A protein has these predicted regions:
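N-terminal nicking endonuclease/strand-transfer module with a His-rich metal-binding environment
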Residues: 1-134
Length: 134
């Protein structure tokens, strides 16, 4: 069963995205996907969405980590599960970058998504009750 945690990113958004998309962690970036942005420029797109919607909050993005038990899933299946989670909780309303890490004893997904809904301009409301425990 996957364990999911989420926390806010209030600064260094570019460094967080750079970290999760590192080649050595993501099987040479094969296990990196994104929605409404390109991973290498996602931090710029996130900030543009904030500016376009005149958002003033301190949270720039959210970092969701989805961890699997050793041997529970293979890297491709973990990435697919991460995409399903993004569709379920973000509903194609938030730009995101998904990276599946395979450099540790357990496979895990990192999802960094914009705190601002690119359609409505409203900020994401974090609610642990909506995060599934796959």
């Amino acid at each position: 069963m996957a364990i999911t945690k989420i926390h806010p990113i209030k600064s260094t958004l570019n460094l967080a995205i750079d970290y999760i998309t590192k080649s050595e962690k993501t099987d040479e970036k094969i296990l990196v996907s994104s929605f409404k942005c390109h991973p290498s420029t996602a931090h710029i797109q996130f900030m543009k969405t904030r500016e376009d919607n005149d958002t003033k909050g301190t949270v720039l993005a959210r970092h969701l980590i989805q961890s699997f038990l050793p041997g529970e899933v293979d890297p491709i299946k973990a990435h697919e599960i991460g995409m399903e989670l993004c569709k379920k909780i973000l509903k194609e309303d938030y730009e995101f970058v998904l990276a599946t890490h395979v450099d540790r004893g357990h496979i895990h997904n990192h999802i960094i998504f914009n705190n601002v809904n690119y359609k409505t301009g409203k900020c994401y409301q974090s609610n642990k009750k909506i995060l599934p425990q796959n």
